[in-house]
C-alpha cells in the first residue's frame, strides 16, 4: 500500500518540484488499479499534492514557474473539483500568454477546453479550441487537438435532435478524422477502424490495448481509445469487457 502512495506522490509531486512540463506525465495501468483500490490514500496524497503546489506557488519567482504550477493544479483538480480545475486552467492560459510561449498557450488552451467539455460545455470547448494558433502547436498537441475536435463533434452528433445539425456535426467529425488520417497516419484509433472493417478484430484490439496501457488517464487520446475498445468488444459480443471501457 505504501509503495502505491509513494508512486502516486512521486507522480503528483513532479511539477511542483520543477521536474515536469505539460504533457509529459504517464501512469501505468497497474498504478491506476492500485490507486482505485486505495482511493482514501489517493485523496490524502492529492490534498498533500495541492498543499505542495500552493506552497510552491507562494514561493515562485518567475511567471514560467507559476504557469507550470497552474497547469499542474488544473490537472490535479481535474474530475475532482471541476470549478477549481477550470480556474487554474484559465490562470495557466493567462500566464502562458503573458510569457509569449505558443507551446504553453496551446497546451493550456487544450486543457481549458477539456475542462469545459468535462462540465458539459461543448460549445465553450469548441470556441476555446477555435482560438488556438495551430502554427504554434507541436505535432503531439495538434494530433490531440484534432482527436478532441472529432470527439466533441461525435458527441454533439449523438446528442442533437435536429437532423440538419446531426449531419453538420457528422461532417465536421469526418473532416477531423480525415485530417488525422492524412497528417498522422500512425494514429492507432484510426488504424484500428481499418482493421475492424477488414474483420481483423484481434489485431485491432491488440493495437488499442497496447496504446491504452501507454496513456495517462487524463490524456486526450484516452477517450477515443476507450470508445474504440468498447465498440470492438460489443461487436464480438463481449459486453462485460466492453463496460470496463465505456466512459460517461
Model-identified regions with their sequence ranges:
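A "functional boundary" signal
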Residues: 8, 16-248
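Bacterial N-terminal signal peptides that target proteins for export
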Residues: 1-6
